[in-house]
Structures are given as structure tokens and as C-alpha cells.
Amino acid sequence: VSFTFCMLNCFGVDNQQTLQYQEENRPLSTFSQGKNPGEKKPVNYQQVAGLIDLRTTYSDGAHDLDFLIDLAKKRGFEVLFINDHDRMAMEYGIFPFRNIIRKREELPSINSRGAEKYFQGIKLAAQQHPEMILIPGSETAPFYYWTGSPFKDNLTAHNWERHLLIMGLENPQDYKNLPVLHNGFSTRYARQLSSLSIIFLILMLLGLILAAKRGYSRILGIVIIVNASLMLIEFNPFKSSLFDQYSGDQGYLPYQELIDYVEDK
């Protein structure tokens, strides 16, 4: 199946555009059939109307998926791209322990409510409406950054509304591993960050050796253990993104990281 996009506004609904969807009428397996494998056969396409960037009540949408499907059918659309938010979270932490002393705000999303449940819902809806083509995906915010300070009443988040659309990924685990800020535990960059993590582990081991002794050495060992543990937690080799929201504008790099990840799937 191949498809191309033709963006247009449709019936006055924000964040919804029509697209031109071209669907091949014969199975993909027939491409390899025939006496001459190199011979190009004519391809028949069927043009259908569709909607892109649809969000449901699974994230911040106003309607559930069944309502959107019924409305789309009434208005002559046959293809729906479902793009709920994969993660909607923001954090601000106090230096030097920004990952420990922090405030987090999060809204419902695919990953906060469960990616498996999200795809099960789309699959069930597709079975109940076989005349419709439902293509799962997400709307994602790979990066944002802070300027100002909450203590000066000028804290500002930048690029929070700079989003990308992901379409066609159907494995829930792929969404759990998206390289975006605040997406939870990830081993994607663990090897890359392991060298610095080893330093903290060595310090903790040194602290344990000193803590086993008596007197001043024991106190020093405990101090080293506590500080090395806090630094390891703050460093977090299992973070979901190589970037953070405190180092200023990172240009296109966080977005390219996400694009490369999706292209590899």
C-alpha cells in the first residue's frame, strides 16, 4: 500500500486536513509473481478522502474514536490517521539536583495511559468499521527548553508547541522508547553514557570501603556514598533523551534524533 498527502482544510475543524490516499488494488505479494520479474505491470489506484492529525479522548481530544469515525463516515471520509499525543509532560527542577528536587506536570497521553490499550482500541474500532482505514500514530513534542527563573517570576518554556506527527508505527514498545523528553526509563543511551556512570559507581565503592573503617574515614565514606548516589541519580544514564530542558535551544538536533529513530523502525 502506498499513499501520498495533499493537505487542505476541511469542514472548519482545527488541526484536521484532508489528504489524498492512493491504495493499490492488488496484494503486495503479487509483485514477485509473473514470468518476467523485471517487467513492470500497470498499477491501479483508488483515490479516497481522509483526515490527518486526529486526537481522541485518549489524550486531549474532545471526542472518542467511535464518534470521530461516525462523523467522518457521514462526511465522506474513508481514511483516518489517529495522532494522539504520545507524551505530554513538563518538568522544572532546582539546581544542582534538577532530577530530584523538581515539579512535574503531565496530561493524559498514549504512554501515560498505556500504549497497548491505545492500539487495542484502534484495532477494535477497525474491526467494527471494516469500511474505514484507520492508521495509528502520534503527535510528539521531542524537546523544549526553559529560560528565566521561578524566583524572578519570568520562567518561560520555549518550543513546547513545536510538534511532529508520527504515522504508521504499530508496535506499542516503539512509542515507549521514543527519544523525547520525560518518556520514562530507557536503555537506548545507556551504553553511550556508561563511561560517566562508572565514575559515580567507583566513588560509591570507595565510599563503602571508607565507611567500613572507623572514625573520620567512616564519616567521609558516608558523605561520598550519599553524594555519589545523588550525582548518579541526577546524571541518569537511563533517560529517554540525550537532551535536557535547561541547556538552551538545541536547534534541529532533538527533532532529527526522533526522525532518525522513526525511520529505523
Language-model features: locations:
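Gram-negative bacterial Sec-dependent N-terminal signal peptides
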Residues: V1-F5
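Extended, charged catalytic domains and RNA/DNA-binding interfaces, predominantly
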Residues: C6-K265
